[in-house]
Amino acid sequence: MEESKSSVASRLMSVKRTSGKSYGRIAEETGLTNVYVAQLLRRQAQLKADTAPKLQAALPELTDELLQEMMKPPLRSYDPHLIQEPTVYRLNEAVMHFGESIKEIINEEFGDGIMSAIDFYCSVDKVKGVDGKDRVVLTFDGKYLPHTEQKSEHMVSRLRLQGD
């Protein structure tokens, strides 16, 4: 019987806790972003074979069994109750509040399109503000994807049907 995603994630988080390392420290040791490390340990991203030895060196308690599990394509999903967690709620609120303006600036700078969440990098950093207080910096670094004009002459499935 296959182990559930939440069970594997729980085991992975236990390995992280045992290590005493932060996501940032693990990221430095593996060459990944801190958010990607968290995604790996929560089974929201797939561990690539060439990264596995670096992650195992950073987290020596990672078993070969867990590494193999992490290399399987994950079920990228989330608990629908997660929105109730205050940090996640405020992040969602910020995106909703600034979303229309961000969309307009993307369109102004790039044209009609979107920012990919597939070809995407994300990090969380801590800086001091001008007032000396801690500030959170979230970086979303996604590939620009233009919307395409849907011309039937470019639709491969139709071209194949016409050629038959």
From Swiss-Prot:
Single GO molecular function: cyanate hydratase activity
Q: What is its EC number?
A: 4.2.1.104
What does UniProt list as catalytic? Answer: R90, E93, S116
Matches recorded under InterPro entries: Cyanase, Cyanate_lyase_C, Cyanate_lyase_C_sf, Lambda_DNA-bd_dom_sf
Query: What domain of life does the native source organism fall in?
Result: Eukaryota
Question: Which GO biological process entries does UniProt record here?
Answer: cyanate catabolic process; response to salt stress
Q: Which UniProt keywords apply?
A: Lyase
The reaction(s) this protein catalyses: cyanate + hydrogencarbonate + 3 H(+) = NH4(+) + 2 CO2
Record family assignment: Belongs to the cyanase family.
Protein purpose: Catalyzes the reaction of cyanate with bicarbonate to produce ammonia and carbon dioxide.
Q: Could you tell me what this protein is called? A: Cyanate hydratase
Question: Which gene codes for it?
Answer: CYN
